[in-house]
Amino acid sequence: MTRVITVASGKGGVGKTTITANLGVALSTYGEETIVLDADVAMANLELILGMEGKSVTLHDVLSGAASIEDAIYEGPGGVKVVPAGISLEGLRKIKMDRLESALEILVDTSDILLIDAPAGLEKDALAAIAAAQEMILVTTPEVPSISDALKTKIIANKLGVDIIGVVINREQHDKTFLTITEIETILEVPVIAVIPDDPEVSRAAAFGEPLIIKNPKSPTSNAIMQLGADLIGEEYQPIEPDKKGVISKLVEGLLGRR
C-alpha cells in the first residue's frame, strides 16, 4: 500500500523543503518508487533545490484544470519522481486546491511513497496538503517560535486524523539557548526521529541546484537524512565517513601535486 506522507513545519524558513527534497532522493536510492509533490503553490522552492526549474507543465496547470497530473511528473535526481508546483503568478490565480485530492489519487497508484511538501502556515493550501496525507513528519528548528508553530500544526493534524510519525529537528547546534530533544518531545508529545545538524554544505548544494545527498554524500546532513529514510522503511544504513585528512594535509598534498 502506498504511503502518503506530508512534510510540514508551521513556521517558514526552517529547511522543510530541503529535507523533503533530499529525503525523496534518499528513499529512491533505497529502491522505493518515490514521488515528491510540491504543494506550496504560492512559494514553490522544491524545483530549485532539485535543479528542475522551468518545467512546461506544473501543479499549477493541474489545479487549474489545464493539464492532467500525469503530465506534471518528471524524473529527478537519483531517480526520484517530482511534481513541481510552478512559479507562474498567472497560473497561481487560476488554481483550485479542491482538485488536489483527485490528483493525488492518481499518484498513489504509481508510487510506493508519495511525499508532499506542505506550505508553511495554516492557510487553506497548507490544510489541504495536511488533510491529503495519511502520515505527517514535522520539521522544526530547536527554537521556541518554531516549536510553537509546529505544535499548532500538530494539533490541526490530529484533528484531521493524520498520524504523526515524528519530529525532525533541523539546524541543530550546541547552543544553550536552544531547546533540548527532551524538551521538544515533551512540548509536542511526539518522538524526535531525526536530528539534522547545522551544515554549511546545505547552502552550497542549493546554490548549485543539486540535492545535498548527491553533491556531498559524506556531509553530516546527508548522513542524517539517509538514516531518516532508512528508518522510515525499516532499512539498515551505514553512514559514509568523511575524509579523515585535515585541511593542512590536503593543502600540503595539493602543493606537492603541483610540482
Give the residues covered by each predicted segment:
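Solvent-exposed alpha-helical segments within well-ordered globular domains of core cellular machineries
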Residues: 3, 25, 44, 60-64, ...
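Conserved catalytic-core segment of NTP-binding enzymes
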Residues: 102, 106-109, 113-208
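Walker A/P-loop phosphate-binding motif and the immediately C-terminal alpha-helix
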Residues: 3-40
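Residue-level signature of catalytic and energy-coupling elements of molecular machines
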Residues: 12, 17, 38, 46, ...
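NTP-binding/hydrolysis catalytic cores, primarily Walker-type P-loop NTPases
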Residues: 212-259
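Short beta-strand "acidic-cap" motif of Rossmann-like dinucleotide-binding folds
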Residues: 33-38, 45, 115, 139
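P-loop/Walker-type NTP enzyme "switch/lid" segment
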Residues: 36-109, 206-208, 214
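Generic secondary-structure signature for well-ordered alpha-helical cores
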Residues: 29-32, 74, 109, 113, ...
